[in-house]
Amino acid sequence: MAKEITAQQVFGLLPRRRQDSHKGSYGKVMCLAGSARFRGAAALAAEGALRAGAGLVTLASVEPVIAAVAARCPECVFLPCRQSAGGGVSAQSGKAVLEKVRGMDVLLFGPGLGDTPDTAALLEQLGPSAGCALVLDADGLNAAAKMDSLPRSPGLPLILTPHPGEMARLCGLTIAEVNAGREGIAAGYARAEDCVVVLKGHRTIVAGPQGEVFVNPTGNPGLSRGGSGDILAGMIAGLAAQGLPPLDAAVCGVWLHGAAADQCAKRLGQYGMLPHDLFADLGALFAAAER
């Protein structure tokens, strides 16, 4: 039976910042994200990782995306990649990305990359060889759904963050079937694939590889906009980079993301709030956790 995530649980799991620490103390995230069409996805994912406390976030993407993100989030480090004919990251960039990702704690793969052959080829190159935890989101999940097995580094954490459509593709089901059995489907897939599944939607489900199932009570329909999931994926990656076990990183990420949305809705209303508005409320939540 699923357990409901609580504020006390989340605040107890969050790592505390030490006086004698430095940026290396809080983990390194590589975000492989963005394309000419979906530049904002990379910006939101990278900032999500930083706002969740990661010490260093590197965005690997094409130059048009990097230019857009640098203007919004100068705290990022950037790895320029070759651009494909469709405006995404070319598979020819795989070797250069792999050289850099091997020094990271987490690879976030997918937000805004585009559902293209290049994305699939990059995942085949990087997933099994990255040597770090892997968070698959968006087009990373779409690419994985077409493969015979999930591409991952052996023995290292894997976190999947699908919405119902992506979960349906992973499982070979219809969206209606996924929505009719959210807890069981997420839990079964997490056990079968030895991973953490974050099945997004109303009362997001977080399932672990040992049969753990949590349901998130926070969040509201104001999150029903493009970009909300990019922030969540970045947050989970940022928390995992700081040393939280993958299940705990997912539990904390979904609760904080939803709680920030609830506070944001009080300020701006569910109609008027936008995903990037969550960052101000997220900061207030982390401040409360530090008290």
Describe every region a protein language model picked out.
Residues 1-133, 142-159, 164-291:
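Small-residue (G/A/S/T)-rich helix-start motifs and N-terminal tracts that mark the onset
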